[in-house]
Design a protein with these regions (language model features):
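Glycine-rich beta-alpha loop elements in corrinoid/cobalamin-binding modules
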Residues: 1-8
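Radical SAM [4Fe-4S] cluster-binding motif and immediate context
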Residues: 12-191
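Catalytic cores of alpha/beta
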Residues: 132, 193-201
Length: 201
């Protein structure tokens, strides 16, 4: 699907949302509320990480929904289900700074806490543009999950096939913490061909 604006807002009224809220299906230990709205603003990822199926599922071209539609979905969640937190499940929510800042501006007006549990790319933008993290935090983001995968450049380059430099990881984590957010990270151990020395590193 190329144009995500052709998608209707999910018909959550057809689902027993209270049942999900009651069992805490959508929230983590750090969640601000058990009444969580899971939402996607975009689809697609330009990366070709060997372990991931996102490009096969959603394509490699990143497409965003209109901000007005995203805000309407959130407002409907608040009105219909008394939502207390938003979790964005996008794979590349930080890939386009312009879209992210526009999203943050809208979220700041709504005033709900939000996070990115799905893991966002620990890329050049996050390592060298701390203003992105500041904008996220000011709009309510209390926690980010950074997809690091490995601390060994050979593994990132030749096993994971991830366009990420090891020396970008620490600055990205530090920038998120300085902005005031909790930081979770994703790591994968035991890739084919990975040595014990590399795992220990």
């Amino acid at each position: 699907l190329i144009n995500l604006d052709n998608l209707p807002i999910p018909a959550r009224h057809l689902v027993n949302m209270e049942g999900y809220f009651d069992i805490g299906a959508f929230h983590s230990a750090k969640s601000r509320s058990n009444r969580v709205l899971n939402i996607m603003c975009s689809r697609g990822c330009p990366e070709k990480c060997t372990f991931c199926t996102t490009p096969q599922m959603w394509g490699s071209n990143v497409r965003w929904r209109k901000i007005d539609d995203i805000m309407l979905e959130i407002k409907n969640g608040v009105k219909d289900f008394d939502i207390g937190e938003i979790q964005f499940e996008d794979d590349t929510i930080t890939a386009r700074k312009k879209n992210l800042i526009e999203l943050c501006n809208g979220l700041e007006k709504i005033g709900l806490p939000w996070c990115t549990p799905n893991g966002i790319k620990t890329n050049y933008h996050l390592a060298n543009q701390p203003d992105m993290f500041r904008a996220m935090h000011e709009s309510g983001c209390y926690q980010v999950t950074l997809a690091c995968e490995s601390g060994v450049q050979r593994v990132l380059d030749h096993v994971v096939n991830k366009r990420l430099k090891v020396d970008q990881i620490k600055p990205a984590i530090e920038n998120a913490k300085k902005a005031g957010m909790l930081v979770h990270t994703f790591w994968i151990l035991g890739y084919p061909g990975e040595t014990f020395e590399e795992i220990n590193k």
